[in-house]
Amino acid sequence: MSELSDAEKRRILKERRQKKFGSGGGTNRLNKITGQADSLMSTESTLDQRERTPEAAINTRQNEAGNNQSTTDNNPQVSLLKQLAEQDRQEGSEAPPDLMSMLQSMTGGDAKNGTPPTLGTPPAPVDQSMLDYHNYLVNRLKAWSIIIKWIVLLPYMYVVTHDVPLSLPFGLMDSSNFFSVLMGFEIVATSIYYKRLQSIEKGTSVNTMMHGSMIAKLISLIPDQAPQQKNLKSRLFTLLQYWDVVSMLITDICFVLVVLGIFTHI
C-alpha cells in the first residue's frame, strides 16, 4: 500500500475535524482551551448554534410583531383613525345621490327640508302621482280655455265677415276694429288663464314651467354665484315667460286668419 500524500493527509484531517465539530466537539474543545468547563457562562460554539439560529430569529420577529400590534391597539389616536376610515368606507358604499339632489345642493336648495323651489333653481323631486295630477289639471285648463275662446270668436268672426245686422256697443261690429277687439279679448283670456294656472300650482306645489319646459331646466343649470349670472338667469326666465304668452297669441292669430279666410268664401 502506497503512502498517502501530504494533500490527502490534510484533507482527511480536515474532514475528521469537521465531523468532530459537527457532533458537538467544538464546544468541548473550547471549554478545555479556555478552562471554563465548569463555568456558568455559555461557551457554546457558533457552529453548534448554526442550526438553531433561524428558529430563534423567527421567534424574535413574531414577538416583536406581537408587541407592535398590542402597542397599536392601545394607542387611542390609531383607534380613532381606524374608526374614521371605517366610516368613510361605509359612506362610500351608499348609493350615489340622484341628479336632482346634486343640482339642488349646487344651487343652495334643500330637498330634505322640503324647501319650495324658486324660479331659477332646479325643482325638487315631486311625487309622480302628484305630477301626473298636476299635468291633468293644466291640460284640462288649456282645453277649456281653447274651447271658450272659440265659442266666443267663431260667432263674432262670422258676424263681422257677413254683415249681420246686430246692434253692439263700442263699434264692435265694425270690421276696422276687429283686430283691436281680438287683441283685447286675447289679453283678458290670457290673464284669466294664468290666474287659474297659478291657483293650480299653489294647490299642487308644482311649478309648471320648471317641470314642463326643458329650456327652463337647462337655464336652471347656470350657476348663480356672481351677480351677473343671477341677472342673466332672471332675464332668461322672464323672456321664457313672455315667449309662452306670445306663442299662445301667435297660435290664436294663425287660427283666426285661417277661419276668416274660410268665412269670406262661404
From Swiss-Prot:
Keywords: Endoplasmic reticulum, ER-Golgi transport, Golgi apparatus, Membrane, Transmembrane, Transmembrane helix, Transport. The chain crosses the membrane at residues 141-160, 178-197, 245-265. It is a multi-pass membrane protein. Residues 1-140, 198-244 are cytoplasmic. GO terms for cellular component: endoplasmic reticulum membrane; GET complex; Golgi membrane. HAMAP family: Get2 (MF_03114). This is Golgi to ER traffic protein 2. The lineage of its organism: Eukaryota, Fungi, Dikarya, Ascomycota, Saccharomycotina.
